[in-house]
Amino acid sequence: MSRPIIVFDLDGTLIDTAPDLLDSLNHSLAASELTAVDEAGFRRFVGHGGRVMIERAHAAQQRSLDVAEHDRLLKLFLDHYTDNIPGKSRPYPGVIEAIARFEKAGYLLAICTNKYEANSLALIEALGLTRHFAAIAGQDTFAFRKPDPRHLTETIRLAGGDAHRALMVGDSQTDIDTAKAAGIPVVAVDFGYTDRHVREFEPSAVISHFDALTVELAERLIRAAGH
C-alpha cells in the first residue's frame, strides 16, 4: 500500500532563497544598466521563474526586451545563481523539525517546484536535505509545470506516494491552483514570495510557521478532501 505524502514547493516555502534570487536578478539588471531592485520590488516580480522575473523587472523601468536579449539576461541570471548555490539560502524556521515529524509519522516527502530541476537538486544537496525527499521535480522534469496539476500528481507518482492521501504545501497562487486542480488539499504559508495575502486564493489552511504544520492538521485536511 502506498504511503501518505506531503509535497512542498521550494522557493518561498521550504527554503528562503530570496536573497540569492535578488542578487542574481540585480546581476542581470546591471548588464542592462538598470537600477537594482530592492526586496519589496523583488516580491512583485517573483513567482513564475527567472524569465518572467527579468521581464517584469525591465517593464517596471519602462524597458522592453527582444527575445535574444531576454535569453542573454536569463543565462546571466541562471549562471550567477547556479555558481553561488546555496549562497545565503536557508530552510525556514521549523522546516527541519517538520520534516522529522512527518517522517516519524510514516509520510513520504517530495518537492514540486517551478525552479529548474538541476538547481533544485543542487540546492537541496548543498543544504544536506536530499535524503529526506523521495522525489524532487522541477519545471523541466516533465513536459508540463505548475499550475498544470500533472506536475503535482506525477511528482507524487514518482515518489511512490498515495495521491488520495496527499497534501501540498506552498506559498503562491500557482501552488494553490495546482493543488485544487489535482483535487489535493493545500496548506499555504503566509511568509513566502507573493504581494497578495495567500488567504485571497482560498487554500485549505494557512500557517505562519512550520510548527503549525502538524500531522494532525495534515490528516484532518486529507480526510476532509473526501478521497
UniProtKB/Swiss-Prot annotation:
Task: Report the catalytic activity.
Answer: 2-phosphoglycolate + H2O = glycolate + phosphate
Tell me the enzyme class: hydrolase
- What protein family does this chain belong to? Belongs to the HAD-like hydrolase superfamily. CbbY/CbbZ/Gph/YieH family.
Taxonomic lineage of the native organism: Bacteria, Pseudomonadati, Pseudomonadota, Alphaproteobacteria, Hyphomicrobiales
**Catalytic residues as annotated in Swiss-Prot or TrEMBL:** 9
**Needed co-factor(s):** Mg(2+)
The EC number(s) given in the record are 3.1.3.18
Annotated binding of Mg(2+), by residue: 9, 11, 171
GO BP annotations listed: carbohydrate metabolic process; DNA repair; glycolate biosynthetic process
Q: Name one Pfam family in it.
A: HAD_2
Keyword list (alphabetical) reads:
Carbohydrate metabolism, Hydrolase, Magnesium, Metal-binding
Q: Which GO terms describe its cellular component?
A: cytosol
* Protein purpose: Specifically catalyzes the dephosphorylation of 2-phosphoglycolate. Is involved in the dissimilation of the intracellular 2-phosphoglycolate formed during the DNA repair of 3'-phosphoglycolate ends, a major class of DNA lesions induced by oxidative stress.
Pathway given for this chain reads:
Organic acid metabolism; glycolate biosynthesis; glycolate from 2-phosphoglycolate: step 1/1
What protein is this chain from?
Phosphoglycolate phosphatase
Q: Which GO terms describe its molecular function?
A: metal ion binding; phosphoglycolate phosphatase activity
Q: Which organism is it from?
A: Mesorhizobium japonicum (strain LMG 29417 / CECT 9101 / MAFF 303099) (Mesorhizobium loti (strain MAFF 303099))
